[in-house]
Amino acid sequence: MKTLILTIALSAAAFADEWPMHRGGPMLQGRSESAAPAKPTLKWTFKAGKPVVGGASIAGDRVYFGDNAGVIYCIGLSDGKEVWSLKTESAVEAIPLILDGTCYIGAADGRLYALDAITGKKKWEPFETGDKILASASWAKDPASDKKWVLVGSYDFSFYAIDTATGKQVWKVETENFINSTPAITADGLALFGGCDALMHVVSLKEQKEIRKLDAEAYVPASAAVDGTMAFFGSDSKKVYAFDVTNEKPVWTYRDRNFSYFSSPALSSELVMIGARDKRVHAIDRKTGEARWTFATKGDVDSSPVLCKDGALVFGSMDGRIYCVESGTGKERWRYEIGSDIASSPAIAKGLIVIGANDGNVYCIGSE
């Protein structure tokens, strides 16, 4: 029964037409309950101070994101008008986590901020780590109570569980290098995160300790996606991995060419879809690890693709375009020219695509 309850909690975000955190929900599967726009048109543009390299979250009628000038923004989803903003002391590359009316986001100043999602006021004083926070936060319930934890890694080599009510540390796990990925949370209470130690760490939330290390052979710049006991991720080893998290040996590895993966994968029932620095998106059979299709752009694809409910796969490229392709075949539906490098990942909800770019703008794309 406990596993069922946790599964329902983790999946709840995926059934709402929102995008409240990195990859849409704690399993980081990159799935949206919204259909992609049929004929893309620009709805609005918001000018931030510096490049927006992480991405946005969408909750209710608002959009949340940070920029490299260190500003956290809340703007209207319908019109792109600023609602509130908060200046931090360094760049903000993380994607906000919106949970129970609070915006949680880390910054390169080493702090995790908890802000009222409506007003922007601080819920509690920022939680301080020993170094910058570039990864986005996730969340889970305390297995022993109804309390909730924000889970986030830092460049101080530590992974933290923080009480959402108080902002106090509940526990932490120390690693041997920088942590730069968002933790993926499995239905049975495991958190998986990677970093510059070339490992995917598996932490038991119940035991509050690391129980396993998965060898990624090189540093892990992005996040894993999990489904059941399976985890999928890429690394600087130029490979994509599929692990059963109960075992330290991979089920399969995929290597196409000698390029790294700085993108987090999206999962369908059959495919793992991930961007690469060979300027392509790769679709890999979940069971066999064999290539199913690739789609070529004219720039690196660090953007993490999003799978929409109508089967569309949406992602950005450093060639300055947003692409929409058929997830089953890789056939292009449409492309939209922004004209500036896109390293950030799309947030998709209510038929709208919200994405940041290196020109300091956030773009909202909808249907004609």
Question: Where is each model-derived feature located?
Answer:
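Sec-dependent N-terminal signal peptides
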Residues: T3-A12
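Blade/loop signatures of beta-propeller domains
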Residues: D17-K43
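Repeat-blade elements of multi-bladed beta-propeller folds
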Residues: E18-G24, G49-I72, L86-Y113, P126-Y160, ...
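Short, glycine/acidic-enriched capping/hinge loops at junctions between secondary-structure elements
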Residues: Q29-E33, A69, G76
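A short beta-strand motif characteristic of beta-propeller blades
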Residues: L42-F46, K81-L86, K121-F127, K168-V173, ...
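Short loop/turn segments that connect beta-strands within beta-propeller blades
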Residues: G76-D79, D116-G120, D163-G167, S204-Q208, ...
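Short cationic/low-complexity microdomains
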Residues: S327-A347
